[in-house]
């Protein structure tokens, strides 16, 4: 059975490879704004889980033809900022700077949603989904440090405008909860969801792959 990651995230791919899974990567191309617009007053956990499910569902036709026996995992992340705002990817340097100034010296909650779909013989036989919240404690970068960080381009395209494993790690005081969820895919949550649909994660392991 193939493990299929419905995400273009290098961080998620790296986490899986270091944990013994070399997935088939298929990018969903889901319009996240359209998915969100189709929901009625979703809570943050409902939104992040719905987005993860949409990504997994979007790749099913292609995966069914290519790997008819597979487990497909979709993921989404967003930050519940210290001021209560729910934020995704900043997109612009100005938005990234504003978010960092609001978060500096405070804590936010990183929400990660996962959806798992099992295919056998090209047909869906099981689905499940869930979410996890992890507290992230932000440092207080100087203006010069913040300018330099934003200039790397890294915070523009990641949920909440920060990374734990890249340049952003210099400005994170700590994480309370599952660190892999902050990287985009929670290993404990994924294992739990796989078990719910009758798949043991150890059957998907291969030798660790260089990141």
UniProtKB/Swiss-Prot annotation:
Q: Which GO terms describe its biological process?
A: nucleotide metabolic process
**Enzymatic reactions:** a ribonucleoside 5'-triphosphate + H2O = a ribonucleoside 5'-phosphate + diphosphate + H(+); a 2'-deoxyribonucleoside 5'-triphosphate + H2O = a 2'-deoxyribonucleoside 5'-phosphate + diphosphate + H(+)
Secreted as UniProt keyword: no
- Enzyme Commission number(s) of this protein: 3.6.1.9
The molecular function terms in GO held by this entry are:
nucleoside triphosphate diphosphatase activity
Indicate whether Protein transport appears among the record's keywords: no
Q: Where in the cell is it found?
A: Cytoplasm
Which Pfam family name is an example for this entry? Maf
GO cellular component assignments:
cytoplasm
The source's superkingdom equals Bacteria
Q: Name the principal localization, coarsely classed.
A: cytoplasm
Known Gene3D superfamilies for this protein? 3.90.950.10
Query: Which keywords annotate this record?
Result: Cytoplasm, Hydrolase, Nucleotide metabolism
**Name used for this protein in its record:** Nucleoside triphosphate pyrophosphatase
Q: Which organism is it from?
A: Saccharopolyspora erythraea (strain ATCC 11635 / DSM 40517 / JCM 4748 / NBRC 13426 / NCIMB 8594 / NRRL 2338)
